[in-house]
């Protein structure tokens, strides 16, 4: 195994869902910016980046969220950095956001945009993304998990611990964030939380995973 391959495998064996961080140890600004950039630079379906990353460092807000986040209580107390990942709503071909992405970010020529919109609509129909608002939002939310995974892997490569979390009251937390002007519920929904820092102690047991042959199947020669 090459040095790079070993480095990657070591990072995946190092990573675990850290329940309690050492509150005295903080992730450096440089390292955390690298983690955020790995999220921002992540791939997404059609390259539309339907996400927003909100870093919650205000302890009073963390305490308020903790009361309604049973799966994140210890992390909210102890994590060096705590991130909420929002998923964008209404990502359709003619929505203002998609038009902004096509015209201002991707710089499509105006005459090519109708053809792009047509292909976009066909894709969403074929994949049942445009069936209803929930399907459309779920598609956006799926993209946030790509960024989430990349952020946690980047952290592990830097020797930083992390924990992804869905253990919260979605409606209540959404209301808190909306009332504080942090979450525009017309544009976004809260997809997932993730905490970063340094473990308070080693995991109580070794990482467990199913065997390679139970989850991986080759069709054709294994090369």
Swiss-Prot record:
The keyword NAD applies. GO terms for biological process: 2,4,6-trinitrotoluene catabolic process. It is an enzyme of class 1 (oxidoreductase). One of its GO terms (molecular function) is oxidoreductase activity. Keywords: Flavoprotein, FMN, NAD, NADP, Oxidoreductase. One of its GO terms (cellular component) is cytosol. The keyword NAD applies. Its EC number is 1.-.-.-. Its cofactor is FMN. SUPFAM superfamilies: FMN-dependent nitroreductase-like (SSF55469). InterPro entries: NfsB-like, Nitroreductase, Nitroreductase-like, Nitroreductase/BluB. Belongs to the nitroreductase family. This is Putative NAD(P)H nitroreductase SAOUHSC_02829.
């Amino acid at each position: 195994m090459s040095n790079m391959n070993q480095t990657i495998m070591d990072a995946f064996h190092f990573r675990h869902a850290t329940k309690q961080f050492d509150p005295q140890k903080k992730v450096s600004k440089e390292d955390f910016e690298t983690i955020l950039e790995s999220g921002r630079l992540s791939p997404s379906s059609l390259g539309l980046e339907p996400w927003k990353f909100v870093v919650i460092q205000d302890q009073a807000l963390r305490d308020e969220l903790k009361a309604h986040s049973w799966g994140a209580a210890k992390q909210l107390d102890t994590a060096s950095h705590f991130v909420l990942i929002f998923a964008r709503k209404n990502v359709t071909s003619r929505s203002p956001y998609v038009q902004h992405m096509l015209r201002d970010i991707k710089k499509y020529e105006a005459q090519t945009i109708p053809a792009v919109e047509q292909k976009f609509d066909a894709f969403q129909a074929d994949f049942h993304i445009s069936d209803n608002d929930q399907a459309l939002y779920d598609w956006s939310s799926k993209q946030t998990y790509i960024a989430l995974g990349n952020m946690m892997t980047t952290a592990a490569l830097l020797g930083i611990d992390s924990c992804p979390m869905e253990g919260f009251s979605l409606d209540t937390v959404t209301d808190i964030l909306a009332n504080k002007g942090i979450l525009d519920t017309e544009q976004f929904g809260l997809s997932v939380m993730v905490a970063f820092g340094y473990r308070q102690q080693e995991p109580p047991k070794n990482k467990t995973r199913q065997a390679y042959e139970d989850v991986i199947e080759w069709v054709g020669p294994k090369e």
